[in-house]
């Protein structure tokens, strides 16, 4: 997992990088009216139009990052067709995307396309028909075929071609680190410190231990090229699983480690 704090336009250089992109785009919030009076007071036709244009900018900025054949999941918490069906139609027509149908059980009471003259598959959750607040969802596929490593069964495929962003970023690794840490590097862990932390997680040899400030995170080594590519373009808030914080001369395990699947519980008798 990598957490970033960046504008969508910052992702644009990461060409053909992601297999799947989930965009829960900012919207006019009509689906929140029942539980949030503030959402009602903020609504206006002008705000709907502002949201629609913002949503399109986000999609246009991140579309190059999606691999050919990749999946875009578009969602909002609003009802109107301007921010929903009209935007899905725009993505289809502007970028040649294929709108995908989903196998949805009839008893879910999902409402389909409300745009006159269109029949592509969308999924609208209305609170008087479904459990929960208002919600909209559509799934699209980018045209083309992605070059994948048949032996890689991970959702996010590794860099496998000379011109992939991950390998290109190797040349700009130092630049990427400056983006993340504003040019200031933290000291590395000593062998003694590393030996302590390695006992806390399973298959520790598969992880890179990254120290940032007084905390240490474990990041899968197999995705270091991808991390380097992200560092070259984005502001990284957190990379990997935060496993320990330093308190005086001691290391204190973090909550994230306790609820992870890689904790060696016997390390804490």
Give the ranges of each region predicted by the language model:
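Conserved Class I S-adenosyl-L-methionine
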Residues: 46, 85-107
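Helix-to-beta-strand junctions that scaffold the AdoMet/dcAdoMet cofactor pocket
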Residues: 66-68
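Polybasic, low-complexity RNA-engagement segments
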Residues: 133, 143-269
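S-adenosyl-L-methionine
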Residues: 1-16
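Core SAM-dependent methyltransferase catalytic element
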Residues: 20, 121-147, 152-153
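Conserved beta-strand signature within the Rossmann-like core of class I S-adenosyl-L-methionine
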Residues: 71-75
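Mobile active-site "lid"/loop adjacent to the S-adenosyl-L-methionine
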Residues: 19-60, 77-83
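Class I S-adenosyl-L-methionine
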Residues: 99-130
């Amino acid at each position: 997992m990598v957490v970033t704090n960046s504008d969508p336009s910052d992702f644009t250089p990461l060409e053909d990088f992601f297999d799947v992109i989930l965009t829960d785009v900012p919207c006019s919030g009509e689906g929140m009216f029942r539980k949030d009076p503030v959402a009602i007071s903020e609504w206006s036709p002008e705000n709907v139009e502002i949201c629609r244009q913002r949503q399109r900018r986000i999609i246009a900025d991140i579309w190059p990052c999606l691999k050919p054949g990749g999946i875009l999941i578009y969602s909002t918490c609003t009802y109107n067709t301007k921010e929903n069906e009209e935007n899905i139609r725009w993505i289809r027509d502007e970028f040649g995307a294929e709108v995908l149908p989903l196998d949805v059980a009839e008893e879910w009471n999902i409402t389909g396309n409300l745009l006159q003259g269109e029949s592509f598959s969308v999924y609208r959750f209305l609170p008087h028909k479904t459990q929960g607040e208002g919600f909209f969802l559509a799934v699209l596929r980018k045209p083309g075929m992605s070059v994948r490593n048949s032996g890689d069964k991970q959702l996010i495929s590794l860099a496998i071609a000379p011109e992939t962003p991950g390998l290109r970023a190797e040349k700009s690794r130092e630049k990427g680190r400056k983006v993340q840490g504003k040019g200031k590097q933290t000291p590395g862990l000593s062998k003694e410190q590393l030996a302590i932390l390695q006992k806390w997680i399973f298959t520790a040899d598969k992880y890179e231990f990254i120290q940032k400030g007084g905390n240490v995170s474990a990041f899968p080594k197999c995705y270091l090229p991808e991390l380097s590519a992200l560092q070259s373009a984005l502001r990284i808030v957190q990379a990997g699983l935060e496993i320990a914080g330093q308190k005086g001369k001691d290391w204190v395990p973090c909550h994230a480690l306790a609820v992870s699947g890689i904790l060696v519980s016997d390390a804490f008798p």
